[in-house]
Amino acid sequence: MKCKELMIYDWIEDRNGFPMKLSLIGETHACAAVLDVAGVVGSYWDFDDNFNEPYPVKLSGEILEKNGWVFNEEKMNYGVKCWSYCDGEVKLSLSLPDEDDKERMVILYERFLDSDSIVYDNAYVHILQHQLRCYGLNELADNMVV
């Protein structure tokens, strides 16, 4: 994953799987904050496309539920699990396959009478954050926790 593909506040990991939140992005480098359990910055970590590149954080049901998404057991079929998020005027549905299946993610956005569905080949936290920002849900995207 290249640094310029990311945005401020995106969640990434280092090569050891330690999650961090991006705080600075350049053309080929990025800086991420290491947060403690209370969400306080403990230190910063530098990433570079040529030496120490960032890795994506795999999206899971646990991460979704930490961020206000609700698991819909009645919509689960063929190994696909569904979660929903509603803030009053916007309703989102997200489908993730079982761990054994391909890492495909489907997001359904509904607002008033409009709806839009997008399929992604990978289920990563930063991809969900980017899509939430496209829907105008910047606060939800920027304040995600892993």
Description of each model-found segment:
Residues 2-16:
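Short coil-to-beta transition motif at edge beta-strands of beta-rich domains
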Residues 29-30, 78, 101-106:
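Hydrophobic residues embedded in beta-strands of well-ordered beta-sheets
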Residues 41-73, 118-143:
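Intrinsically disordered, low-complexity, charged/polar segments
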Residues 90-123:
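Intrinsically disordered, low-complexity regulatory segments enriched in Ser/Thr/Pro
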